[in-house]
Amino acid sequence: MDLKIISLSEDKTKELYGSEDCQKILSIYEDYYQKIGYNLPWVGYFVLRENQIVGCCGFTGQPKDGKVEIAYYTFKEFEGQGIASFSCKELISIANQTDPTVIITAKTVPEYNASTKILQNFRFTFSEIVQDEEIGDAWLWILDTGKTVSFDQC
């Protein structure tokens, strides 16, 4: 699998972006970049597997106050195939390579599910309940930098 940056000027007519999911994500990011800015590498990414887009992931903006939030999404028909875990791993890697001091966070709906399990596998720990403009009450997770993450095991 690979990541492909969702750029400011994607050609929505490309065959690669033909699915309804891709079109929706492209529209979301078109608006989202106007809100958060387009500052590499703190952007959105498509997840590619065998030249097919199977999900997306990204940062919710540039680091602020030494923290950056990650998010990931697997298209429904590809769930359970390790795509979200791959996305989480890659975003952690990008953040650490860009700024090893940045604190990496994530938010989830307030219930245990596949996403919370992925975060726990990557050594994120629950911090507190916070408000999120999309979710409402959300669980805030913070990557525990005191623990070593072995990407081979995740």
Where are each of the predicted segments found?
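Acyl-donor (CoA/ACP) binding surface of acyl/acetyltransferases
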Residues: 1-24, 31-33, 39-154
